[in-house]
Each structure stands twice: as C-alpha cells, then as structure tokens.
UniProtKB/Swiss-Prot annotation:
Quaternary structure, from the entry: V-ATPase is a heteromultimeric enzyme composed of a peripheral catalytic V1 complex (components A to H) attached to an integral membrane V0 proton pore complex (components: a, c, c', c'' and d).
Any Gene Ontology CC annotation: lysosomal membrane
Lineage: Eukaryota, Amoebozoa, Evosea, Eumycetozoa, Dictyostelia
A Pfam family matched in the record: vATP-synt_AC39
The keyword Iron-sulfur appears for this protein: no
Protein name per Swiss-Prot or TrEMBL: V-type proton ATPase subunit d
Amino acid sequence: MGLFGGRKHGGLFTFNKDDGYLEAILRGFKKGILSRADYNNLCQCDNLEDMKMHFISTDYGDFLAGEPSPIHTTTIAEKATGKLVSEFNHIRNQAVEPLSTFMDFISYGYMIDNVVLLITGTLHERDISELVDKCHPLGLFKSMATLSVVHNVADLYNNVLIDTPLAPYIQGCLSEEDLDEMNIEIIRNTLYKAYLEDFYNYCKYLGGQTELIMSDILKFEADRRSINITINSFGATELSKDDREKLYPSLGLLYPEGTSKLGKAEDVDQVRGILEVYSTYRNFFSDGVNNEKSLEDSFFEHEVHLNRMAFEDQYGYGVFYAYIKLREQEIRNIVWIAECISQNMKQKMNQYIPIF
C-alpha cells in the first residue's frame, strides 16, 4: 500500500473516512461561486446599492445587511473576505492530520504578507493597533497578542516573529539586522521562496493526487514570482543579478535553465525572449506587457485555469487550496466591478476574470 494524502492507505475509503466529509462541504461551497449570469447582472447595476440587492439572490446572501448607506467598495471587499475566512475556518477547525497541516500551509502565504506589513510599519513608527487592523485575517498568528511590547524591529524579531509558524523561514533566511537594512520586497521574496519550497516538498511527501495537482499549481506560482522579481528588479540599484537569482524559488517549469537565464536578463524584451520556448507562458506574456490586458491579468487567468482544473480530480487536497484561490479571485472581480461603478467607468467593467 502506497502513500495517499500522507497516509499508508487502503484506497479511497481511507480518504473518505478522514477527509470525505470536509471535501463534500467544500464542493458545496464551490457551488456558490458566482456564475457568468451573476456577473452579467452585477455589471447591469447602476450603483453599489443595486449590487447589494443583487447579492441577496447569490451565495453571499445578505452579507451587507446592516451596512449604512452609502456603501463603499472597501466595505464590500472586507465583508466578502470575511465570508471566505469563515469558510476556511469551518474546514480548518474540523480537519485532522495531514489535512490540518495542509490548511496551515495555505495560511502561511497570507502570514508572510502580514509579517512584511508589520516590519514596514514598525520601521516607519506606525501605530501597532492600526497595523493589525490592516493584516489579512487568514494570516493572523497567536504572537500578535504581544505586539504591544514592540517598539522597534529588534522587539518585533525577538518577541513576535520567532514565535510564529514562519520562524523556520525567518531564522533560516533573515537576521535581526536584515529587517532594518534589507529592502522590504527582498525580505518578502526571501520568505516566500522558503515557503514555496517547503510547501512543495510537503505536497511531494503527501504524494498521490495531492502531489499531482499541487505540483502544477506551486510550480506556476514559483514561475510567476521569478518572472515578477526579474521585471521589477530592472532599474533597482540595490539588487544585483546574483542577488536577484537567489530570490527565485528552486522549483517550477523555468527552474533551473529558465531561471538561470532570467537571472542574467537586462530588460523586458530579453525576458520575453527567454519565455518564448515555454508554451505555457509564451502567449500571455506577449499579450500582457504593453496591451490593455496586463501581465498580472494573464497570470491571474492561468491561475484560475489551474485551480478550476483541480476540481476535476478527487481524493486529494488540491481542491482545498484551489477553492481559496478561486474565491480570492472572485473577490477581486467583485471589487473591480464595484470600483468601475463607483468611478463611472462602465466601459471597463467587463475586464474581470470569469471563474466558471
């Protein structure tokens, strides 16, 4: 008997016994993802109050009930995110090993963004309580309770960060002095590299359908980060080519040959040339650099495709990751439409990324 979701298993019955109930709940959640008809109706709205009324007929229900008028886009984003967090916690609180650890890995990406926010705010002497309010709720951690004792980055490192689940990444990659001296985006990418490699190895350890689905998803995420790091580094004097290459995750379709070439690239045209030999990235990169559709949009579209395909599979944990990411894209779509309505830019309203 081989590995199945990290267990010595006897087939789908073992998966169904431990994780089948939660997968069924998740697939029920998935049915509530907005349809193309829902998006068409949202795009017909004249104001945000109309959007509020339309949401009542969707899975979002009356999630904006009680919100005073006029409703703001930030309120819609906050409440939609709150719904996603509630669903995530519902699954996580009932999960057993190894699904519980897999769900924790999902939260670590948001935790990294929160840590970077706290470091940035501390360096600029921002109010700590204000920083916590801006943290993503999926990336909260217990040692945030000790933030009241933080007065500088040394306090943050020694009293907070080393007690987070990210401690192995932080202690393995960053020193206390780095927080004060290193560019904040280098810190973010250093932590994310360690996180992606760890998550990828964990999915390989789980094996089975989890490894199969998550391998494609995480390899794409690694490639996206490598491409973005390269493009964003052009003109950045504090980042040498050698330092840039150290930030690339050690996985992906581009790794190692493509990332080695990216490390030597001088401009966007050279990046485009490097990616020409990779059919996955060739077209949407050329579509997205100087045209109306941004490179970021092309990345989001491919991410949606990979996560949507995860639901064609069964008996693995990929759907749990995919659902969170699809809902996240849905929230971006909702916010985009709401912003277009608020700013009277209805001609751009249809530039959202459909999911199903």
